[in-house]
């Protein structure tokens, strides 16, 4: 396909190219890749969500960057990509969860909420005068006593995962998750794995750049800075030990 032919399909959000692609959706995925990495880990006790909170300047308040969000008492989300788009999706998710709680007197299911969100995302790929959301979400929660973890895509596709990373350095973070994941992980093990995976992707990060939450039957809980510092120290110590072993070999 030559340049002029591509441009004919490049401007519309609801047009397929002859080779079956929607270019605006692909551009939205690129926006997600430009964001700082976030990840989720499903454990035997619930779900861990973690994010790297990087700032473009030392003068910017890191606390102003929100990437982990409480949706309901036992539901949380992590976001990557275009911040304003992510905020709109988080607001939509919260409203949906609250409406379901008020209507039926019980929390919305993790899968039900995810599919409602992705239905909303998918509509933006079929309507003229709109553009796809340049953000992806990880939705984690507890359903029927078990943790569940889903990821959304700018195309509106939901996927369930045991452990997954989105955003920048995704391949490196995902590889670390695959190396360390086990079905019987506890929440504490999941927190350790989350920090190890983010450290593996960027060895220059500091502990105060990390945010972690757990979502379990106890609810949505923010991990305190002291615990994060301990997890970070353990992860970096393990990394240094591995490098020493490699040099000795």
Curated annotation (Swiss-Prot):
GO terms for molecular function: endopeptidase activity; threonine-type endopeptidase activity. It holds the Pfam family Proteasome. Disruption phenotype: Strains lacking psmA2 gene alone display relatively normal growth rate and overall cell yield. However, depletion of psmA1 and psmA2 together renders the cells inviable. GO terms for cellular component: cytoplasm; proteasome core complex, alpha-subunit complex. The formation of the proteasomal ATPase PAN-20S proteasome complex, via the docking of the C-termini of PAN into the intersubunit pockets in the alpha-rings, triggers opening of the gate for substrate entry. Interconversion between the open-gate and close-gate conformations leads to a dynamic regulation of the 20S proteasome proteolysis activity. It is found in: Cytoplasm. Induction: Up-regulated at mRNA and protein levels during transition from exponential to stationary phase. The keyword Membrane does not apply. Component of the proteasome core, a large protease complex with broad specificity involved in protein degradation. The H.volcanii alpha1-beta-alpha2 proteasome is able to cleave oligopeptides after Tyr and thus displays chymotrypsin-like activity. The 20S proteasome core is composed of 14 alpha and 14 beta subunits that assemble into four stacked heptameric rings, resulting in a barrel-shaped structure. The two inner rings, each composed of seven catalytic beta subunits, are sandwiched by two outer rings, each composed of seven alpha subunits. H.volcanii produces at least 2 types of 20S proteasomes: an alpha1-beta proteasome and a proteasome containing all three subunits (alpha1, alpha2, and beta) that appears to be asymmetrical with homo-oligomeric alpha1 and alpha2 rings positioned on separate ends. NCBIfam families: PRK03996.1. Belongs to the peptidase T1A family. This is Proteasome subunit alpha 2. The lineage of its organism: Archaea, Methanobacteriati, Methanobacteriota, Stenosarchaea group, Halobacteria.
């Amino acid at each position: 396909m030559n340049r002029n032919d591509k441009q004919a399909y490049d401007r519309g959000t609801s047009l397929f190219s002859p080779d079956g692609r929607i270019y605006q959706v692909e551009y939205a995925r690129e926006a997600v890749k430009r964001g700082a990495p976030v990840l989720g880990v499903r454990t035997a006790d619930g779900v861990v969500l973690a994010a790297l909170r990087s700032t473009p300047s030392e003068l910017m308040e890191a606390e102003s960057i929100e990437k982990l969000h409480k949706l309901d008492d036992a539901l949380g989300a992590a976001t990557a990509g275009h911040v304003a788009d992510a905020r709109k999706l988080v607001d939509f998710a919260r409203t949906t969860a609250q409406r379901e709680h008020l209507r039926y007197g019980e929390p919305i299911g993790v899968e039900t909420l995810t599919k409602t969100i992705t239905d909303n995302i998918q509509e933006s790929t079929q309507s003229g005068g709109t553009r796809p959301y340049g953000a992806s979400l990880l939705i984690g929660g507890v359903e029927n006593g078990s943790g569940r973890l889903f990821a959304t895509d700018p195309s509106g596709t939901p996927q369930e995962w045991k452990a997954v990373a989105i955003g920048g350095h995704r391949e490196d973070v995902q590889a670390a998750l695959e190396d360390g994941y086990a079905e019987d992980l506890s929440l504490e093990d999941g927190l350790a794995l989350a920090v190890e995976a983010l450290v593996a992707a960027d060895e220059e990060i500091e502990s105060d750049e990390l945010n972690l939450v757990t979502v379990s039957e106890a609810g949505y809980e923010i991990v305190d800075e002291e615990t994060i510092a301990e997890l970070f120290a353990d992860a970096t110590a393990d990394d240094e030990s591995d490098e020493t072993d490699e040099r000795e070999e």
